[in-house]
């Protein structure tokens, strides 16, 4: 059986706030760790029937980028729902939410 790994290396300040987030994966095209400003990982716990989440962001990630990041995450869920369940209605509803959120952040003062 083939195996693959994803690794995260998080540098924390004295208050345990992420200063630097690095990641690497065995299937990543380039070699070595790459910096990221935020990660959001969701895991389904089959025993508890709930989702475990890990959300981290570096303290220098701009708020505007954080909002875009979460809209991108939600949009990715739309494709995941469609691919994994075939539920076109649910995928379309998620996409519509993303479109509303994009309009919302575009209308916010800079």
Q: What is each model feature region?
A:
Residues 12-13:
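Short, acidic, Ser/Thr-enriched surface-loop or helix-capping motifs
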Residues 78-110:
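C-terminal charged interaction modules
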């Amino acid at each position: 059986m083939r195996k693959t790994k994803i690794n995260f290396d998080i540098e924390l300040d004295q208050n345990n706030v992420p200063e630097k987030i690095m990641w690497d994966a065995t299937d990543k095209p380039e070699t070595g760790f790459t910096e990221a400003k935020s990660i959001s990982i969701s895991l389904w716990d089959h025993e508890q029937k709930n989702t475990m989440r890990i959300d981290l962001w570096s303290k220098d990630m701009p708020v505007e980028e954080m909002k875009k990041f979460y809209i991108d995450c939600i949009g990715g869920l739309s494709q995941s729902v469609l691919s994994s369940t075939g539920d076109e209605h649910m995928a379309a509803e998620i996409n519509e939410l993303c479109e509303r959120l994009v309009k919302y952040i575009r209308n916010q003062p800079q």
